Design a protein with these regions (language model features):
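Conserved AdoMet/S-adenosylmethionine-binding subsite of the radical SAM
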Residues: 1-127
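Domain-scale selection of a single, long terminal region
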Residues: 123, 134-135, 154
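A cross-taxonomic marker for long C-terminal extensions/tails that follow the last structured domain
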Residues: 143-159
């Protein structure tokens, strides 16, 4: 499917509009190669800072973190990158802190990061075993997020 999309995009060389790729970050190396030279901006959602949380909550692949990191590094080599991080209650240290430390260390302090507080416990999560996710972020959580972001050293973070 990605090859068909890429073909359609390349057949419109007259457009001056940037091509924006919005993804959960779980895609193949082949997809990344196809996107190279076509996409101007890549936005990847980086939700979990470790594989254990990713698999437990979202049934993500067991190598979730390495896939996201691989695709972020590749995307940064051929496009602008925006990383979106949804803050989950109970996952500030195990996920948020790990994600921000990785970004600073491996992608640089000026990579665009959007830290989002919009998490709402809805739908099936209220019936799930994920007790930490059955609440919104508290005021204390939000204050800790700001502290974690400051400590990360990232310089291009929006909320």
């Amino acid at each position: 499917m990605i090859s068909h999309i890429a073909q359609d995009i390349t057949q419109c060389p007259h457009t001056k509009n940037p091509v924006f790729w919005n993804s959960n970050g779980i895609y193949s190396e082949l997809t990344s190669e196809i996107l190279k030279g076509i996409v101007d901006i890549v936005k990847i959602d980086f939700k979990y800072g470790n594989d254990k949380c990713a698999m437990r909550i979202s049934k993500a692949p067991p190598n979730y973190v390495s896939i996201i990191r691989r695709n972020l590094k590749r995307a940064k080599s051929y496009s602008e990158v925006l990383i979106r991080v949804l803050v989950l209650p109970g996952h500030l240290d195990c996920c948020l802190r790990n994600i921000l430390e990785y970004i600073r260390r491996d992608l640089g302090e000026y990579v665009r990061v959007n830290v989002m507080f919009q998490y709402r416990p809805e739908y099936k999560v209220m019936e799930s075993e994920f007790t930490e996710l059955k609440r919104r972020l508290s005021k204390g959580d939000v204050e800790r997020v700001y502290k974690i972001v400051r400590e990360s050293g990232l310089k291009n973070v929006i909320f």
